[in-house]
Amino acid sequence: AKGCPDIYKQDILPTFELEISPTVLSKLEKEWASGDGDKPDHPLASFKYEDTVITDAVIQLRGNPKWWFQSPDKMQFEIKFNENDKQARFMGLKSVLFDAARYNESFLRDRLALKIMRDVGVPAPCANNARVVVNGEYYGLFVNIEKVDSEFLERYFEFPDGNLYKRDDWEKKTNEEDKDDSDVEELIDADNYAELDAVMNIDQAILEWAAEAVLPDNDGAWAGGLNYYVYNDPLTGFNIIPWDKDATFTRIPHDVDPYKDIKPNDHGRPFYDIVTKTPAGYQKYVQAIEHVLKTGYDAPTLQARIDEWSAQIDEAAKSDPNKPFSDGDYSDALKELRTFVKKRAEFVEDWLD
């Protein structure tokens, strides 16, 4: 895999300047207030980063509309650069995504979770934080997160032309003009180890589940959630690509069992069950948890990272005029996150023993 695109480097806090016409801004605000799940595209007057100015991008709302009401003044955006010209890119990217989940009060959850996943060898999107300015005024601090799309696949996979599906409703996200989705049907229909092994990169899936279990994550493939993609790599079969890591760390108690725990109202995790119910699969899963702890979840390293990143974003977080929580909540969330990773690492260590 190639390294992260420059705009997601950990040692920068980029500022993106958006010029949005009054008409478009009022449409976006109405859509946000009404929880409009259609998320239509609107023309963006201009997108500026340092010396780069783009005037033919489009803007739309992003995130899950059912949570928007929790954050009345702080919309979340996707900016698309290739809607009007299919070849257009910004620093090699088709889109940028600005995420601000209501309960990510440290601003660091996705960023830390995805970094851990990349460190242990999971193909996971890149993320840092970014300041967003709207019509000349500071609008807020966001998680700046890489979109899982064809550009992402090109970065990670030797053969990036396979089918990508989003778990939510198994919607096809690449090669959409080809209506054949029999490959994912075969994956969904697999009901024993041999059938699954024929279509899925099981070792990769085990690593992905183990990483989510250690974090822990309450909404991905491991917990019986819907926040992940599957990519049918022509070389290895279906790989699991994690997504949306704001329901991680302090969203869950530090002592959830890395094997048994499952989210309330889960959506099932048939692939996980098939694999971990075989003695060999379970053995590999435990080894993967050990690997994640050793290569990605060293508490002092994570705490140093939290300290470094929180120093980087501190001024931007505190001066964010639209965040739906207080500076005190932000500071508390950082302290809780620091304490949590230590407790979690100790708990998983004991569980392995």
Residue ranges and their predicted role:
Residues A1-D353:
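Phosphate/dinucleotide-binding and metal-coordinating scaffold of catalytic cores
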